[in-house]
Amino acid sequence: MSLPFTLHSLAELDVLGAWEWYEQQQPGLGDRFVVAVGAAIVRASRWPNAGTPAIHDDNGEVVERRVATAGFPYAIRYRVTDEQLVVMAVYHQRRRPDFGVDRLS
Protein backbone atom coordinates (compact mmCIF):
# COMPACT_ATOMS: atom_id res chain seq x y z
CA MET A 1 0.00 0.00 0.00
CA SER A 2 1.32 3.43 -0.91
CA LEU A 3 1.13 6.64 1.07
CA PRO A 4 -0.51 9.59 -0.64
CA PHE A 5 2.06 12.21 -1.57
CA THR A 6 2.35 15.91 -2.28
CA LEU A 7 5.17 18.12 -3.49
CA HIS A 8 6.32 21.18 -1.59
CA SER A 9 5.69 24.18 -3.84
CA LEU A 10 9.43 24.75 -4.20
CA ALA A 11 9.97 21.09 -5.10
CA GLU A 12 7.56 21.61 -8.00
CA LEU A 13 9.80 24.47 -9.15
CA ASP A 14 12.85 22.22 -8.77
CA VAL A 15 11.30 19.71 -11.18
CA LEU A 16 10.24 22.40 -13.63
CA GLY A 17 13.70 23.97 -13.70
CA ALA A 18 15.44 20.66 -14.31
CA TRP A 19 12.85 19.68 -16.92
CA GLU A 20 13.50 22.92 -18.82
CA TRP A 21 17.26 22.36 -18.74
CA TYR A 22 16.99 18.75 -19.95
CA GLU A 23 14.55 19.74 -22.70
CA GLN A 24 17.05 22.33 -23.97
CA GLN A 25 19.73 19.65 -24.10
CA GLN A 26 17.57 17.19 -26.03
CA PRO A 27 13.83 17.28 -26.76
CA GLY A 28 12.08 14.57 -24.76
CA LEU A 29 14.85 14.25 -22.19
CA GLY A 30 12.96 16.50 -19.78
CA ASP A 31 9.95 14.20 -20.02
CA ARG A 32 12.17 11.20 -19.23
CA PHE A 33 13.48 13.13 -16.23
CA VAL A 34 9.94 13.75 -14.95
CA VAL A 35 9.12 10.04 -15.34
CA ALA A 36 12.26 9.16 -13.33
CA VAL A 37 11.28 11.61 -10.58
CA GLY A 38 7.76 10.17 -10.52
CA ALA A 39 9.12 6.63 -10.21
CA ALA A 40 11.33 7.70 -7.28
CA ILE A 41 8.34 9.29 -5.56
CA VAL A 42 6.24 6.15 -6.07
CA ARG A 43 9.08 4.02 -4.63
CA ALA A 44 9.29 6.30 -1.61
CA SER A 45 5.52 6.26 -1.11
CA ARG A 46 5.47 2.46 -1.17
CA TRP A 47 8.45 2.02 1.15
CA PRO A 48 8.80 5.31 3.05
CA ASN A 49 11.38 4.02 5.53
CA ALA A 50 13.63 2.55 2.86
CA GLY A 51 15.08 5.91 1.80
CA THR A 52 18.51 6.90 3.06
CA PRO A 53 18.30 9.14 6.14
CA ALA A 54 19.12 12.68 5.01
CA ILE A 55 18.27 15.05 7.87
CA HIS A 56 18.04 14.33 11.61
CA ASP A 57 16.52 16.40 14.40
CA ASP A 58 18.35 17.37 17.59
CA ASN A 59 17.44 14.01 19.15
CA GLY A 60 18.90 12.03 16.26
CA GLU A 61 15.51 11.06 14.83
CA VAL A 62 15.23 10.92 11.06
CA VAL A 63 13.27 13.93 9.78
CA GLU A 64 13.85 13.52 6.04
CA ARG A 65 15.00 10.73 3.77
CA ARG A 66 16.24 10.68 0.20
CA VAL A 67 15.83 8.42 -2.81
CA ALA A 68 17.84 8.67 -6.02
CA THR A 69 16.24 8.91 -9.45
CA ALA A 70 17.17 6.26 -12.00
CA GLY A 71 19.20 7.49 -14.95
CA PHE A 72 19.71 11.05 -13.69
CA PRO A 73 22.04 12.51 -11.03
CA TYR A 74 19.05 13.75 -9.03
CA ALA A 75 17.40 12.66 -5.81
CA ILE A 76 14.20 13.48 -4.02
CA ARG A 77 14.24 14.38 -0.36
CA TYR A 78 11.02 13.73 1.53
CA ARG A 79 9.43 13.57 4.94
CA VAL A 80 6.52 11.51 6.20
CA THR A 81 3.92 13.43 8.20
CA ASP A 82 0.36 12.53 9.15
CA GLU A 83 0.35 9.42 6.96
CA GLN A 84 1.45 11.39 3.92
CA LEU A 85 4.72 11.70 2.05
CA VAL A 86 5.81 15.28 1.33
CA VAL A 87 8.54 15.76 -1.28
CA MET A 88 10.59 18.65 0.07
CA ALA A 89 13.20 18.98 -2.69
CA VAL A 90 14.33 17.52 -5.99
CA TYR A 91 18.03 18.22 -6.32
CA HIS A 92 21.22 17.44 -8.24
CA GLN A 93 23.22 15.15 -5.97
CA ARG A 94 26.66 16.18 -7.19
CA ARG A 95 26.21 19.92 -7.43
CA ARG A 96 24.18 20.83 -4.37
CA PRO A 97 23.66 17.87 -2.03
CA ASP A 98 22.34 20.12 0.75
CA PHE A 99 19.95 21.99 -1.54
CA GLY A 100 16.61 22.83 0.07
CA VAL A 101 17.47 21.73 3.61
CA ASP A 102 16.02 25.00 4.87
CA ARG A 103 12.52 24.14 3.61
CA LEU A 104 10.45 23.54 6.69
CA SER A 105 7.02 22.60 5.38
Can you describe what each PLM-predicted range is?
Residues 69-105:
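Enriched for short, Lys/Arg-rich terminal
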